[in-house]
A protein has these predicted regions:
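Glycine/tryptophan-enriched, flexible segments
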Residues: 142-298
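Small-residue-rich helix-loop
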Residues: 294, 302-307
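Pre-Walker A segment
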Residues: 310-311
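Alpha-helical context
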Residues: 7, 36, 40, 90, ...
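Trp/Phe/Arg-rich N-terminal binding region typifying the photolyase-homology
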Residues: 1-160, 265
Length: 311
C-alpha cells in the first residue's frame, strides 16, 4: 500500500457517499484530490456549466479542507496531466466511473497508461443506482422499453444495495502533489452575466441537501402535476447537482423511501430517477442515439407544416 493517494474528481463534488474519496482517506496517510479542467469539454455553449464548475470547485475545496485534504486543479488533457505521475512517486489513484461512451473509452486509455507506468489504481461505481452492464433481459440483450427495465432495476437495487462505510477520515496534514494549481475563479466565463445567476443558485453539496429536504417536505406529494406548471416551483431543482455529483442518486432514493405516506407524486419522482438510469443504459448499448434516432424509421419522420396548429 502506498503512503499517498490522489482522488481524481470528475463529476463527484461531494464528501458524503463518495466511495473513492472515503476509500482513499481510510487506507492512505496522505490524500490529495485532483480536478483536471479540459478546455475542450467546455465550448461557448457550456458557459453556464463553466460557472457552475467554478463555484462547485470553490465550495468543494472548503468541504475537503475540513478533513485536511487539498483540492488541486490542473488544466489540460487528462492523459497529458496524468502522465506526470510516475512509479517513483509512490502514489495510488482512485476515481469514480462516469457512464458516457466517450469518457469510458478515454478511461480505458488512462488505465492502460497506469498499467504501463506501474501505477496502482482503483475505480468505483459512479453516480448511479445499478450499473448498466448488470441490467439486461433474461436473454442477455439490453432493454429498449422503460417499464420492464426500471421494474427489474429497482428490484435489483433493493435486494443488492450493500451498506458500506463511506465516512471520510481526516488527515493529520495536507499535501499537494502538483507544484502549481489554478484557481477556480480562472474558469469563470469572461463576461459576468452570471452575477444575476448567483442570486438563484449556489452550487454546493449543502444546497443539494437543502433542495432534497424541500422536495421531501413540500413538493413530492404533488410532483406529478406541479412539475409541468412553469409558474409554480414544482421541480426538485436537483438536476445540476446530480450532474456535478454534489449529491448521489442513492442519497435521493433512500431519503424518498423514508416518506411514510407515499402519494402518486412519489412514484412519479422515483420514475424520473429510473429514466436517468435507463438513459445511461441506452446511450451505452445504443451509442448511435447520441447522434440519431434509436429507431431508423423515425429518421424521415414526416412533419406537418401548419401554422394554425400553433395558435
Amino acid at each position: 500500500m502506498t503512503k499517498k493517494a490522489i482522488v481524481w474528481i470528475r463529476e463527484d463534488f461531494r464528501v458524503e457517499n463518495n466511495e473513492a474519496l472515503a476509500y482513499a482517506s481510510q487506507t492512505h496517510e496522505l490524500v490529495s484530490a485532483l480536478y483536471i479542467y479540459n478546455p475542450k469539454n467546455f465550448d461557448k455553449k457550456r458557459e453556464a456549466q463553466k460557472w457552475w464548475l467554478s463555484r462547485s470547485l470553490e465550495n468543494f475545496s472548503l468541504d475537503l479542507k475540513k478533513f485536511n485534504i487539498s483540492l488541486e486543479i490542473q488544466s489540460g488533457d487528462e492523459l497529458d496531466i496524468l502522465k506526470n505521475i510516475k512509479k517513483e512517486d509512490d502514489v495510488s489513484i482512485y476515481w469514480s466511473k462516469i457512464y458516457e461512451p466517450d469518457i469510458i473509452n478515454k478511461g480505458k486509455k488512462i488505465r492502460d497508461l497506469f498499467i504501463q507506468n506501474d501505477i496502482k489504481y482503483k475505480y468505483f461505481k459512479g453516480n448511479i443506482l445499478v450499473e448498466f452492464q448488470e441490467m439486461t433481459k433474461d436473454d442477455g440483450t439490453p432493454y429498449k422499453v422503460f417499464t420492464p427495465f426500471w421494474r427489474k432495476t429497482e428490484q435489483f437495487y433493493i435486494s443488492k444495495s450493500p451498506t458500506k462505510n463511506l465516512k471520510i477520515k481526516s488527515k493529520e496534514k495536507m499535501i499537494n502533489f502538483f507544484k502549481k494549481s489554478i484557481s477556480p475563479k480562472e474558469l469563470l466565463p469572461k463576461k459576468n452575466w452570471y452575477k444575476k445567476f448567483e442570486k438563484y443558485w449556489n452550487p454546493s453539496e449543502d444546497n443539494a441537501k437543502k433542495y432534497l429536504q424541500e422536495l421531501i417536505k413540500s413538493k413530492i406529494e404533488n410532483y406529478g402535476e406541479t412539475r409541468d406548471i412553469p409558474g409554480v416551483s414544482g421541480t426538485s431543482k436537483l438536476s445540476p447537482f446530480l450532474k456535478f455529483g454534489q449529491i448521489h442518486v442513492e442519497t435521493i432514493w433512500k431519503k424518498c423511501q423514508d416518506i411514510k405516506v407515499k402519494q402518486v407524486g412519489y412514484r412519479k419522482y422515483i420514475n424520473e430517477l429510473g429514466w436517468r438510469e435507463f438513459s445511461h443504459s441506452l446511450i451505452n448499448y445504443f451509442p448511435q442515439m447520441l447522434k440519431g434516432n434509436l429507431r431508423k424509421d423515425f429518421d424521415n419522420f414526416p412533419w406537418v407544416k401548419n401554422e394554425k396548429f400553433l395558435e
